[in-house]
Amino acid sequence: INIDRQTYGHTSKENDQQKTSTKTALLNKDFRQALGFAIDRTNYAAQLNGKEGGSTAVRNIYVKPDFVQSDGKDFGTMVMDQLPSYGDEWSGVNLADSQDGLYNPEKAKAEFAKAKEALQAEGVQFPIHLDVPVNQSSKITVNQVQSIKQSVESALGKDNVVLDIHQLSADDFNNITYSAPNAAAEDWDLSVGVAWEPDYLDPSTYLDVLKTTSSENTKSFMGYDDPNSQAVEKVGLKEYDQLVDDASKETTDLKARYEKYAKAQAWLTDSALYLPTTTYNGAAAVISRIKPFSGAYAQAGDKGSSYYFKYLKSQDDIVTKKQYDSAYKDWLKERAKSNDKAQKDLAKHVK
């Protein structure tokens, strides 16, 4: 979500009033939450994976839910424990991967109703027009953006919110998203052109990226690069900075460290400044003759990538779903033992 858009080279907005209305709306937390609850992530993922496999790629929070664990709880559960303190809309929300724990049209309508009342008092003009650029050469991504448009407009009503899709060449798309030289060149309201992969096994590898001082990343994720901008103050991002900094200072108690990072993630989820949809790990169906889980596995770094071949074992027959599921169950058991040992060893080294 772009909280401080400055350029309108690719827009369907017809006047300054519409530009101001959109910017004001995106600075309203209830409005952003309405968008988050209105996105059907399963249908979004199904544009790549098909209807049957749509849920496999769904992600609900920025940090991978099982990225770290402590005392039998994974990171996602720690976040779920803290979210209800931000409001009743978070009660019962499931943040685990491979299921859509956020899509809820009724919650979307409720949050939007609160937002609309406040925004109308500020003179905001409806419907809110949201510019969404997409690389026209990627048919799957175009379909995914169209699925977001359908679910959001269906949940909130076209008289309230309209997503204007702009199909651009690859160069034009990259120049206003991935490759934009600064925040001023980020020419969008909503973008599907952002992603992040962890570099090391600590929540900070995700959460540090969105601190207000990380301008190279905040320009792409939220459309600003000035940590002291009015938009940053309006949405309260300095509070997020403080939560992340507090967590980073906890170096003696691993459980306390993870709990503090979970608090920062809970704040981020409630803020709805970043709306996760899918993970690259939930890919489309493939034909494989690689023995399931024979290769290296890593939550961070490059050893878990598809380009790391050490330990891989091949087989003559194509891997079946039955074989994969059986191997997965065995792997989960072994991983639980390994994780428990690793967490105990790591706790001894945290200084």
Predicted stretch roles:
Residues I1-T77, D81, A96-D100, P127-S137, ...:
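Alpha-helical secondary-structure segments
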Residues N2-L26, V68-E106, Q120-G123, Y178-A184, ...:
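Short, solvent-exposed loop/beta-turn-alpha elements that line the ligand-binding surface or hinge
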Residues Y8-T11, A46, I140-N143, F173-I176, ...:
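Extracytoplasmic/secreted cell-surface and envelope-processing proteins
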Residues K29, Q33, F37, T42, ...:
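Solvent-exposed, polar/charged alpha-helical surfaces in well-ordered, non-transmembrane soluble domains
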Residues A45-N49, K114-S137, K238-S288, D345:
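Bilobed periplasmic-binding protein-like "clamshell/Venus-flytrap" ligand-binding domains
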Residues G53, Y86-P198, L254, R335:
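Ligand/substrate-recognition segments at binding pockets and active sites
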Residues W188-L207, T277-Y280:
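Ligand-binding clamshell of periplasmic/extracellular solute-binding protein-like
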